[in-house]
Structure formats: structure tokens, C-alpha cells
């Protein structure tokens, strides 16, 4: 009996489980691993003191990108583009590779010259005047190394000279001459490209330390200033700006460091600059602007970064130059303007770069551009309603009277017609 009851209970349990599986099959849902930025952003909704959090820059003030590439498995790709790899190295590593390449090639061919002399037996007939060696006066590895340097650098033979009785030496001489020319072209080319890089030219392109938000021509604008310290100008200069801000889509996807274009005059051509003196770059905050709904009180709470990029060709070399900088929320001043730096002197304009980064406070509403537009619309609406509403009300009353009293309207029309006939008579 006990075994029968146990068997019956087990079957009931199995049948119940199978029915449950038929009704509702459990599915193991694996939550995707959030990016590190998203995991860091999760407790921010609970934290009240968000303004004190340090915002991690995407681009530093000096223009260097604050991004490190990790877990790169396909490192062979760096060797396929060996020229760019060498140019991107620091100067100390570049000079070390430069010296090592020449030293290794000299030692390699010096070893081969010594082996040829050793195999031919030239070392055993150094003092024999009747013996014709492959290379005269080559009596050891040091002399072979010096002969290799003389051959590859083409400084001219002196005490050691190759003879015509050594065909293997002649072939080796041709190989070393060709490979030496290739090494010279490659290494000198790398050094020339590294020296002529326009990165240092970007050091003389300066951006203001702060960006400002104030009114300009009755519109709320975001502004920053750029300048060129050199007398040789940047040709075909253009500027653009990006807003770096993490976002979450309506489907729940988290996009870290989402990039949004900031219009600084692309459609009007104001983004193309004649950068002879410092210029103030302006972005009008309108409905297409990402700052449309941001007010003065909300700005410190936002976690965003504005990346500005200035590009152009160096007048002296014709190479493309790019300068970058960025502004975080703590570097955006609401209600300020830049101090003028350009003054007219006797026959020329003078730029005072001591005041390049200075700002002064000005009267600016603390509302967002959206709120200002709504207030402006509310101020204009009663003027239009006062005329149109009265006309509509008058028309509606007339139509209602006509619908209610159609007979009276016909009698009035008849009376008017009789009066006209009597007046004619």
C-alpha cells in the first residue's frame, strides 16, 4: 500500500508539472550586461547631490581624447600599417628604433662579411702577400663591422677594399647597397613625417576656457571664442561642435557618449572662418538645439560635454591641422559675455590676448529658450484673438438668427424691395 500511494503521488506531481509546463512554460531571460557608464549612472537617480559628481571628460582641454583601447586582440593590424605605428610612437621610442635598425643592419652584414672571409680562409693568410682575399685588410669581426658601415653609408672605401676575385662578395655588396637604400628611405621618411606633423601647430590655436550663454539679437545663444596666436594664418578654417551625452532610448537601450551635432552656422556658412583675429562662435538655441529645454537652474544638473573642433590647412606647409577642446557644465557660464579684445590703433588693429578668456556678467533671463518662446507666444496671442474672436462671434450670431427666423428675414427683404420701388417712383 505504501509503495502504491508513493507511486500515485509521484505520478500526480509529474502530471501537475507537465500541465503547468503546458499552461505556462518558464523562459530563462538573461539580462544583458550594462556598460560601465550605465552601471555608474544607475544610482544617480537616487543621489540628490548630482552637481558635486565629477564629470569624466571625453576630450580634455588640451584636445587629447580621454579614451584607452583595451583587449585589442588583432595586434597584427598595427604591423600592417607600420609607418603610422612608428609615427605615432613617442620620440624616445622612435629614436631608439632609429638607432637600433641601423645598428642591427650593420651588425648583420658585418657578420656575413666575416663569415665569407672565414670560409674562404682569408683569416689564415693575413700576412701572406701572394693571397688575394675577398676584402683586403679584413682580419677580424671588428674590421668586418667597419667595412659593413662603409658599404651601407657609402662614405667611401679606404683601408679595406673588396677585390674582383670574390663573386660572393660582389653579390653581397649589391644586396647590402639596395637594402641600405631601403632602410634609409624608410627611416628618414618616418622621421620627416614625424617632424612635419601639424600637431604642434594646433598648440597656437586657443579656445576660451569657458563657454557662455546670453542673449544676442533677442535670442538665447551659446558662445565660445577661438583665436590664432601666429601671424601665419590657417587656410580654409572651419569649426564644428558636438554634444556628448549619454541617453536611453524608448526601448530601454542605453547609448553611452551619444554624439549630437550643434549647429554653429553650417547652413548659413558661418562655420567657415577667416581666423585673423579672435572670433566668437555662436550657437542659436532654437527648437532644433539640444539646449532648447535647459534653463539656468537645470544646467548644473546636466551631465554633458561640448566638444569643439577647429580644422584648417597650415599656410606654411599646406598640411591639415586640427585643434580640439571641450566644455563641461561647470565651464558654461549662464548670463555672461566675452570681453572685447580687438582695439583700433594708429593704422592697425591690436589684439589683447590678456583679455581673451575674460567674461563679464550681463542681464540674461534664467528661463530656457523653450519657456521664453512660450512666454512670447502668450504675449502675442491676445492681440490676434481680440479681432478674430469678435468677427467669429458676430458671424455665428448672424447665422443663428437666420436659422431661427427665416420668415422674418424674407419679410424684411420684401419690405426693403418695396421701399426701393417707391423711392424709384
UniProtKB/Swiss-Prot annotation:
Please indicate the ranges of residues that lie on the Extracellular side. 117-140, 160-168
Phosphoserine PTM positions: 18, 25
Membrane topology per the entry is: Multi-pass membrane protein
Keywords in alphabetical order = Ion channel, Ion transport, Membrane, Phosphoprotein, Potassium, Potassium transport, Transmembrane, Transmembrane helix, Transport, Voltage-gated channel
* Compartments in which it is found: Membrane
Which body tissues produce this protein?
Expressed in insulin-secreting cells and brain.
Q: Which GO terms describe its biological process?
A: potassium ion import across plasma membrane; regulation of monoatomic ion transmembrane transport
| Intramembrane zones | 141-152, 153-159
Q: Which domain of life is it from?
A: Eukaryota
Q: How does it assemble?
A: Associates with KCNJ3/GIRK1 or KCNJ5/GRIK4 to form a G-protein-activated heteromultimer pore-forming unit. The resulting inward current is much larger. Interacts (via PDZ-binding motif) with SNX27 (via PDZ domain); the interaction is required when endocytosed to prevent degradation in lysosomes and promote recycling to the plasma membrane.
For this chain, the family text in UniProt reads:
Belongs to the inward rectifier-type potassium channel (TC 1.A.2.1) family. KCNJ6 subfamily.
Q: What role does it play? A: Inward rectifier potassium channels are characterized by a greater tendency to allow potassium to flow into the cell rather than out of it. Their voltage dependence is regulated by the concentration of extracellular potassium; as external potassium is raised, the voltage range of the channel opening shifts to more positive voltages. The inward rectification is mainly due to the blockage of outward current by internal magnesium. This potassium channel may be involved in the regulation of insulin secretion by glucose and/or neurotransmitters acting through G-protein-coupled receptors.
Put simply, this protein is called G protein-activated inward rectifier potassium channel 2
Give the organism the record lists.
Mesocricetus auratus (Golden hamster)
Q: Which gene encodes it?
A: KCNJ6
Amino acid at each position: 500500500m505504501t509503495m502504491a500511494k508513493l507511486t500515485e503521488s509521484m505520478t500526480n506531481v509529474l502530471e501537475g508539472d507537465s500541465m503547468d509546463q503546458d499552461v505556462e512554460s518558464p523562459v530563462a531571460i538573461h539580462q544583458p550586461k550594462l556598460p560601465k557608464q550605465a552601471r555608474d549612472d544607475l544610482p544617480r537617480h537616487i543621489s540628490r547631490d548630482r552637481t558635486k559628481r565629477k564629470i569624466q571628460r571625453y576630450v580634455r582641454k588640451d584636445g587629447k581624447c580621454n579614451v584607452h583601447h583595451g583587449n585589442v586582440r588583432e595586434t597584427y593590424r598595427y604591423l600592417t600599417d607600420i609607418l603610422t605605428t612608428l609615427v605615432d610612437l613617442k620620440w624616445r621610442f622612435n629614436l631608439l628604433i632609429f638607432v637600433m635598425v641601423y645598428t642591427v643592419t650593420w651588425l648583420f652584414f658585418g657578420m656575413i662579411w666575416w663569415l665569407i672571409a672565414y670560409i674562404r680562409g682569408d683569416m689564415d693568410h693575413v700576412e701572406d702577400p701572394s693571397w688575394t682575399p675577398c676584402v683586403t685588410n679584413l682580419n677580424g669581426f671588428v674590421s668586418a663591422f667597419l667595412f659593413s658601415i662603409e658599404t651601407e653609408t657609402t662614405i667611401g672605401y679606404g683601408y679595406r677594399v673588396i677585390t674582383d676575385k670574390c663573386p660572393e662578395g660582389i653579390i653581397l655588396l649589391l644586396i647590402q647597397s639596395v637594402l641600405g637604400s631601403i632602410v634609409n628611405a624608410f627611416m628618414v621618411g618616418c622621421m620627416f613625417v614625424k617632424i612635419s606633423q601639424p600637431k604642434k601647430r594646433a598648440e597656437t590655436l586657443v579656445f576660451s576656457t569657458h563657454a557662455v550663454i546670453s542673449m544676442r539679437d533677442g535670442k538665447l545663444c551659446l558662445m565660445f571664442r577661438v583665436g590664432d596666436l601666429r601671424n601665419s594664418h590657417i587656410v580654409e578654417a572651419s569649426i564644428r561642435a558636438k554634444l556628448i551625452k549619454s541617453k536611453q532610448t524608448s526601448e530601454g537601450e542605453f547609448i553611452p557618449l551619444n554624439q549630437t551635432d550643434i549647429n554653429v552656422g553650417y547652413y548659413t556658412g558661418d562655420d567657415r572662418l577667416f581666423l585673423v583675429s579672435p572670433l566668437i562662435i555662436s550657437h542659436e538655441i532654437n527648437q532644433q538645439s539640444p539646449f532648447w529645454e535647459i534653463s539656468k537652474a537645470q544646467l548644473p544638473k546636466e551631465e554633458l560635454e561640448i566638444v569643439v573642433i577647429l580644422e584648417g590647412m597650415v599656410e606654411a606647409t599646406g598640411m591639415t591641422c586640427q585643434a580640439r577642446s571641450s566644455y563641461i557644465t561647470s565651464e558654461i557660464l549662464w548670463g555672461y559675455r566675452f570681453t572685447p579684445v580687438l582695439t583700433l590703433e594708429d593704422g592697425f588693429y591690436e589684439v589683447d590676448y590678456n583679455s581673451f578668456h575674460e567674461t563679464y556678467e550681463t542681464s540674461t533671463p534664467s528661463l530656457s529658450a523653450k519657456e521664453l518662446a512660450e512666454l512670447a507666444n502668450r504675449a502675442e496671442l491676445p492681440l490676434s484673438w481680440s479681432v478674430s474672436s469678435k468677427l467669429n462671434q458676430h458671424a455665428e450670431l448672424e447665422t443663428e438668427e437666420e436659422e431661427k427666423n427665416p420668415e422674418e428675414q424674407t419679410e424684411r427683404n420684401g419690405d426693403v424691395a418695396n421701399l426701393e420701388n417707391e423711392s424709384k417712383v
